[in-house]
Amino acid sequence: MINIYDSANQLAQDLTKTDQYKAVGDAVKAVQADDESAALFKKMDEIQAKIMQAQQTGKPLSDEDQKAYQELNAQVQKNDKIVALLKSEQGLYDLLGEIQKAYTKPINDLYEGLRN
């Protein structure tokens, strides 16, 4: 019997060897090395957590938080290190999306007869 977790753990190890993963790692280091970028990233992370909490609880985001997010987003777009991090993250998420398609294909194939 196959242990699917062994395959998943191997995939996780292989992921760390991809160019996309390495690009995110390099971008994270660049943000960490710059105090302004690191502080801005921390603020961005905090406001995103507030947004997610509001979405999960169904509560609207306060006007103050909306304004803070818009101002912070404008600052983020001007910070080359964070922009590079976000772009590298997108590359990694694109790769993960392709991987997800590959490992969910057998599941989708099971339903093919029902869809036709």
Curated annotation (Swiss-Prot):
It comes from the Bacteria. SUPFAM superfamilies: YheA/YmcA-like (SSF158622). InterPro entries: Com_YlbF, YheA/YmcA-like_dom_sf. Belongs to the UPF0342 family. This is UPF0342 protein lhv_1666. It comes from Lactobacillus helveticus (strain DPC 4571). The lineage of its organism: Bacteria, Bacillati, Bacillota, Bacilli, Lactobacillales.
